[in-house]
């Protein structure tokens, strides 16, 4: 492997990592906003939406921090974080699908899950 090839791979890795962190940030923002719009004393389905939205926002925020900061996690630890984020995002998207007006947040969740999948695929 030449130096330029390894540098190109490093640049691509960093770009993919940043894209995943950015998708996590967008999802966290969308879910936090959607959760804040739900009546905390609402029906059981509203409470489920609020809890899933808050959980998704927190997991996405934590994942973004892992990806954007100098982390002491090894590759296996990063993979576990990404898989957890992907799972939580997909669960949240399913709940959001049942609520009119939550389409943008559901889309952000799915995009984040896909970004996590894509980045996992770059890990060895």
Language model segments and positions:
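Amphipathic alpha-helical hairpins
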Residues: 1-124
